[in-house]
Amino acid sequence: MSYEPATAATVAGLSVSGVKTMRVALYQCPPRPLDVAGNLQRLHQVAMEATDADLLVLPEMFLSGYNIGLEAVGALAEAQDGPSAQRIAAIAQAAGTAILYGYPERSVDGQIYNAVQLIDAQGQRLCNYRKTHLFGDLDHSMFSAGEDDFPLVELDGWKLGFLICYDIEFPENARRLALAGAELILVPTANMIPYDFVADVTIRARAFENQCYVAYANYCGHEEQIRYCGQSSIAAPDGSRIALAGLDEALIIGTLDRQLMGESRALNRYLSDRRPELYDDLSKR
């Protein structure tokens, strides 16, 4: 069996031409529940340490903490263009680095969502994504589920998709983004013990089966009864990890490389070898 050269690889109509590398930083940290001002301050400090990265990714609900309850999440929820977004836009400009952060979003109709927002290095809001698959009583007690909206945006020549924590555990979500052209799927998370196998195994599997990069930014430490499992990572299309944190606070940086993605797609043609006519009924069950 012969393959086309990796440098010319196009799989399922997805080209790997363009800007060759991107530097992505993940900040793994213990949560500071209810301390928005304190979280903005440490974001500023971390962003100044990550100025050599093109993008800084923070955990799920970074601004407010995750396990904070309905009353607190209602009090701390903000609009997409709220005061915290304006502050983070200024931080992104000062650092010259795009920032993806998790926060409780209050929509114009009063619904509260578990959301992430991307602000570029010029301080412009590029994208807001709402968690679509809510996890257990914890999420269901605080948030409304996001609707059928899986945005794909371009940053520095790379196509980015977004998921939040539990979303990545449904393989259809990552595949949908990959088929739409995502080269990097960003996953702010608040993953806890005993689900650490997700950080260890699932993230690499999603990257490999979809032939794209997956960046997974988790908490460490604990929040009330929750013990977070750390292990933030950037998984490559070949299933390797180009950056990996342990169990403690860490700022890790990895370089995404289009050549590696092209080589991997030339060897593993999952996207073009699909037979969707065999799977149509699966999503209807």
UniProtKB/Swiss-Prot annotation:
Gene Ontology biological process terms in this record: putrescine biosynthetic process from arginine
CN hydrolase domain: residues covered: 22-258
GO molecular function, one term: N-carbamoylputrescine amidase activity
Active-site residues, record numbering mapped to chain: E60, K131, C165
EC numbers on record: 3.5.-.-
KW Phosphoprotein (keyword) present: no
Residues in coiled coil: none
Keyword Hydrolase belongs to the record: yes
Key words, A-Z: Hydrolase
Protein name: Hydrolase in pqqF 5'region
Organism, as annotated: Pseudomonas protegens (strain DSM 19095 / LMG 27888 / CFBP 6595 / CHA0)
CDD domains membership: R-amidase_like
InterPro entries xrefs: Aliph_Amidase/BUP (IPR050345), C-N_Hydrolase (IPR003010), C-N_Hydrolase_sf (IPR036526), RamA-like (IPR044083), UPF0012_CS (IPR001110)
Homology family: Belongs to the carbon-nitrogen hydrolase superfamily. NIT1/NIT2 family.
